[in-house]
Each structure stands twice: as C-alpha cells, then as structure tokens.
Amino acid sequence: MRQRVVSLLFPSVGTFHPLAEKAQMKYLDEYRDGELAQQLAREIHRVTTRPWNIMEVCGGQTHAIVKFGIDELLPNQITLIHGPGCPVCVTPLEMIDKALEIAARPGVIFTSFGDMLRVPGSTTDLLSVKARSGDVRIVYSPLDAVKLAEQNPAKEVVFFGVGFETTAPATAMAVFQAAQKGLKNFSMLISHVLVPPAIEALMSSPNCRVQAFLAAGHVCAIMGYEEYPPLAVKYRVPIVVTGFEPLDILQGILMCVQQLESGRAEVENQYARAVRKQGNQPAQKLVREVFRVVPRKWRGIGEIPASGLGLSAAYAAFDAEKRFGLGNHHVDEPADCLSGLVLQGQIKPHECPAFGGKCTPEHPLGATMVSSEGACAAYYRYRRHSVTETALAR
C-alpha cells in the first residue's frame, strides 16, 4: 500500500523519490506517513534558497496545516498564508441577516448545513432563532430539504445554499428535482461563490504578498482547473491543485517552491488521484443549467465581479430572496472583529486582539471562529495554548 502512495505522490516531483521499503499501512493513514512527511520536508529545505509566500485557498488544508504542524516543518523562508478558503466564512453579513429574517417567519421550515447555525449575523444567529421557536433544521444534503417540502406542503421550506463549486451541483440538483416535482413551497437562499475570481481579486490588490497558490482539490474535482492557467500567466504565480492530507500539502508546497525557484509560473496537479483537468462534466452541465454567474459580495473582502452563482431565469421561481421580498441593505462588520484581514491573508488569527479573549468558539465575533473550516477556529482548537497567552497579553 505504501508503495502505491509513493507512486501516486511522487511521479512528477523532480528527481525526489522517498524510499518505499515499508510495511503495508491502513488506507486512512497512508497519506499521513511521518517518515514520508519528513523526507518531503527535507526536500523542501534543500530546494528553498529564497523567501516565498504561498497561500492555500481551502479551509480543509488550513486545518490540516495547523493540526499536523505542517508549517513548523518548513524552512523559515517559506510563509504559508491562509486565504479565503472557507465558504461559510465568506458568506456576507447581509446574507446571514436575510437567513435570520426568513427563519423567524411563521410557516417557514428553514434548512441549512450545521456550520451556518452559529455564524453571527448583525444581532443574532440561526441557533438563537431556533431557540425562540423558529423551525430551523440541520440537513446533510439539499435533497433532504426537497423531501421536507414534499412532506410539509402547508409550509414554506427554504434551503440556505452556501459553498464553493464543490457543493453547487448538489444544490443545483435539489432545485432541478423541486422543479421536476412541481414543488411550489420550496425555495433557495443562494450564496454560492466561485474560487478563481477570488484569486484574481486577491492578486489585483496592491497589498497582495502571495507568490504561489495551493488550489483546493475538492473544488477542482468538480470544476477542473482549466480556469487557472490564464491566472498563472497573468500574475506570474504557480498554482498547484492540492489535496488535504499532510503528504498532499507538503508535496503541493514542494511543487510550488520548485516552480518559484526555477522562475516558472504554471498550473500543476498534485491531486491527480482525484482531479482531472476537465473536472466532472455532468456536474458542470447541471450547474450551468440551474445557475448563472453573478457578482457576489465576500465577507471581509467586498464585492467581486462574476464570483457567485444565482438562479437562472428558468429557475427564478425558487429564489427565496424574491419570494420573501427581501431587499438589499448594508450592514457594518463588528469593529473589533478582524476576520476580513484573516480571510485576505493579511494577518494570522492570533494577531487579532480579540482572539481567545473576546472571541472564542463559544462566543464568536465572526464566522472564522465558528466554522469547522475557519482559520481562527483552527488556531483556537490546535494552538490556543501556544498563542492565546500572547493574544491575551495584548
């Protein structure tokens, strides 16, 4: 089994091939092999001659980096920057408030993934609405919400559609099925966002320090990575499609450094065991049918053109914003929450004065401390003993 992992991980990483003479491993552990991780880290040290800043755009990668101490294995010249890789975290405050408004209405069953229930809006959160007798339910698939609509014809069932390209096909399928079933009591509050436009927005910023990207493997498994080469060429940044396990991330970093050190700026696929260049074309076809590309506001970043998905004209009847007559209104972020700077990679979570004091998972100021993929939550869970005292001292 370990030989298979080696062959999957290291076919294209220069001339570096870790030894494979080891006993078989459990499949769940094979991409967490400590010896292979050390060998990858040594190779990164060997090839690194200059300082480089690499951003991961995936909350799962961020949590793996912090949980397994991947950044602590790297040479001092390598800085990992945590980007806007958590879809819950970038959902704008205004959209949370719209969800709260709908969920509090009588006759509504409001459904959502569990992560969204504790994300603070401007005054409260969905969990508090539920505690005050709002019918707020956690579902594990948008299709569960469709079933609820079938089972409760006298109720308005709303699903909060949040996520990157990864979850968009499931949301699209739910809308498609609702249309096929003729459900008049089902609608979607849509806040899906697209990753490539966000990368472009980050690179266009005058404050951007990013020199290479680890692209999210799960996003590319759906959408492929044909959108990335123009960005790599335009901004002269290596982009490596990367998985989520420690060996995946270390290899992705190594591939980035090899490109940076040799002056290349290309798109490479570290996660070839799960990602193809064209992605999942049937899923893409469904997304194109149900959705259209729209501007979308990202929490902490602002509006990014063509960075979101909204329902297409053929499925506009399922738009919860229109059905419930929700208008647009501006809401200011809490002044003492710096999650926007965290999402842009300008500061690390523990550099926020509120971290670990005024802001904890039990009493969060922002979504980055609530979500299972949030950078602040990762630092609090895995590093609070090493960073909280420093934060509190401020």
Task: Please describe what each predicted stretch is.
Residues 58-61, 164-166, 192-196, 217-220, ...:
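Glycine-rich beta-alpha junction loops
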Residues 23-154, 168, 180, 189, ...:
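Metallocofactor- and cofactor-centric catalytic cores in central/energy metabolism, strongly enriched
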Residues 209-272:
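A conserved active-site cap/scaffold subdomain adjacent to cofactor or substrate pockets
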Residues 151-161, 166-216, 222:
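Active-site histidine-anchored catalytic micro-motif
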Residues 251-341:
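Internal helical hairpin/lid segments
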Residues 51-54, 185-186, 263-272, 298, ...:
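Flexible, glycine/charged-enriched surface loops at secondary-structure junctions
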